[in-house]
A protein has these predicted regions:
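STAS-like cytosolic regulatory interaction modules
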Residues: 1-50, 60-97
Length: 97
């Protein structure tokens, strides 16, 4: 893998559902991004349903990114995502305003 690929910014756009049924699919996408990029942008604007597994997936992703010195930022977050993160006490850990 070239240095150019390592310095590009990756984008992940979530569909309307981020729950246990989608966790394995997103785990693969997120893991690939960690291997390929130094900066990742997440678009969670379309999320209409998220459960504990979805929040755990995001939390694990943020922790893995931190250990690999990969920067993550949100392009957008849906109200559902914001409320779920707030209720679970994860807004800080998930860098959600």
């Amino acid at each position: 893998m070239s240095d150019t690929a390592q310095n590009t910014e990756g984008l992940i756009t979530f569909d309307d559902t981020l729950d246990i049924t989608m966790a394995a699919t997103y785990f693969e996408k997120l893991t690939e991004m960690l291997d390929q990029h130094k900066s990742i942008v997440l678009d969670g604007d379309g999320i209409e349903r998220i459960d504990g597994a979805g929040l755990q997936l995001l939390l694990g992703f943020f922790k893995a990114a931190e250990s690999l010195h990969v920067t993550i930022k949100w392009q957008a977050c849906s109200d559902i995502l914001k409320k779920s993160a707030k209720l679970s006490g994860m807004t800080g850990s998930l860098a959600i305003d």
